[in-house]
Swiss-Prot record:
GO terms for cellular component: TIM22 mitochondrial import inner membrane insertion complex. This is Mitochondrial import inner membrane translocase subunit Tim22. Pfam families: Tim17 (PF02466). It is found in: Mitochondrion inner membrane.
Length: 184
């Protein structure tokens, strides 16, 4: 009379075909590397995954990521400090005039953009320098961040002279050492 079996082309799920694909002979064999994780067999990584790992571990990618992160963090920090500052929007020529909301927002945006650019440059410089130092030394330890902090701080400080460059090197290296000590 009425058949409960549905034809294969009507779009309903056929659990027997799914089970055969997942468990049966249509299942793709997984090649294992015997010593992958301390003797535990692990599957071989496909070429796409290896390529993505190489890209994400490159110094250029790390510097770009630090640049974008520094820009966002610096912008937020700049807008926050402008919001706290009581002199935002005031005109020094006419100190008695109350600034409009448009003037205050313009000043907050300018300060946020200034902080964002500075944080982005410092973040990219430090990250790229640390990656290059780590690649050169072949080690990942606290000395990399101290050396890259000294190089970055010195490069920023040397724009103001030799003394500022030496102080920038020492200050940024010390700050990097403290941050690295607490994060590791």
């Amino acid at each position: 009379m009425g058949s409960n079996v549905t034809p294969p082309g009507d779009g309903t799920l056929q659990y027997s075909l799914i089970m055969q694909h997942l468990v049966g002979d249509k299942r793709r064999p997984v090649e294992l590397i015997p010593g992958g994780l301390g003797g535990i067999p692990t599957p071989i990584k496909p070429e796409e995954q290896k390529m993505m790992e190489r890209v994400m571990e490159s110094c250029g990618f790390k510097a770009a990521l630090a640049c974008v992160g520094g820009f966002v963090l610096g912008g937020a920090f700049g807008v926050f400090t402008a919001g706290i500052d009581t002199n935002v929007g005031f005109d020094p020529k006419d100190p008695l005039r109350t600034p409009t909301a448009k003037e205050v927002l313009r000043d907050m945006g300018q300060r946020g953009m200034s902080y964002a650019k500075n944080f982005a440059i410092v973040g990219a410089m430090f990250s790229c320098t640390e990656c290059l130092v780590e690649s050169y030394r072949g080690k990942s330890d606290w000395k990399n961040s101290v050396m890259s902090g000294c190089i970055t701080g010195g490069a920023i400080g040397f724009r103001a002279g030799l003394k500022a460059g030496v102080l920038g090197c020492g200050g940024f290296a010390a700050f990097s050492a403290v941050i690295d000590y607490y994060l590791r």
